[in-house]
């Protein structure tokens, strides 16, 4: 199994959304085309650093490959709905697991504290982001993203509208967690100059 096939195998919710709309033969053919498109992108961007490739290979390039392939066949509007529905269903599933975890004693405080080291490692300069980090306050974490590889590479690949979906996924994951409030006033994907991120205990 190739690298692109392994990645696409993990995108079952996207395939299911396509299957709901199209005959199986057509869905399977488009999925194969998207897989091949992903392989091309992997080769084209093979020199990207490891931290950045975590985002491009697991999220950005598969989404672009699926969306652009669908767009050519079923049109932009329907392709966008497929991507939005599958992404938000994935985010909702993550939120459900997170809610269960946060109901355990002490987990809300630990969750907030974990964000500083987590974002610096996974969403810092080594992963293609540019950030403004704010001083830590008890029970609160704040950070701004002023440059984002999702916005950059989706735009470069001709599908900047997908960035908005990625921004929306955060709202689905963090927007209704027990004992925590997620605050955001703007995102790069929605035309803002930054993605401001604040999560705090309430």
State the predicted function of each range.
Residues 33, 129-132, 182:
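Generic structural motif
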Residues 1-70:
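N-terminal, charged low-complexity regulatory/assembly segments
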Residues 139-142, 148-202:
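C-terminal non-catalytic interaction appendages of large macromolecular assemblies
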Residues 69-157:
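Amphipathic interaction/junction segments at domain boundaries or subunit interfaces
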Residues 58, 62, 78, 162-166:
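Short amphipathic alpha-helical segments
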Residues 18, 70, 122, 170-173, ...:
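Hydrophobic, Leu/Ile/Phe/Ala-enriched alpha-helical segments that form helix-helix packing faces
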Residues 26, 78, 181-182:
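Secondary-structure boundary/capping signal
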């Amino acid at each position: 199994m190739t690298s692109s096939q392994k990645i696409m195998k993990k995108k079952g919710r996207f395939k299911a959304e396509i299957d709901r709309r199209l005959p199986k033969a057509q869905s399977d053919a488009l999925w194969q085309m998207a897989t091949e498109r992903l392989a091309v992108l992997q080769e084209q961007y093979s020199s990207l650093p490891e931290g950045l490739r975590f985002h491009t290979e697991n999220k950005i390039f598969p989404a672009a490959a699926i969306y652009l392939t669908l767009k050519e066949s079923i049109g932009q509007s329907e392709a966008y709905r497929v991507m939005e529905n599958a992404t938000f269903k994935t985010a909702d599933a993550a939120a459900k697991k997170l809610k269960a975890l946060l109901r355990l004693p002490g987990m809300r405080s630990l969750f907030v504290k974990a964000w500083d080291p987590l974002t610096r490692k996974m969403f810092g300069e080594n992963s293609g982001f540019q950030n403004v980090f704010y001083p830590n306050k008890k029970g609160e974490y704040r950070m701004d993203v002023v440059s984002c590889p999702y916005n950059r590479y989706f735009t470069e690949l001709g599908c900047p509208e997908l960035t908005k979906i990625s921004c929306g996924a955060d709202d689905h994951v963090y927007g209704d967690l027990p004992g925590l409030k997620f605050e955001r006033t703007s995102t790069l994907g929605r035309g803002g100059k930054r993605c401001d991120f604040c999560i705090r205990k309430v």
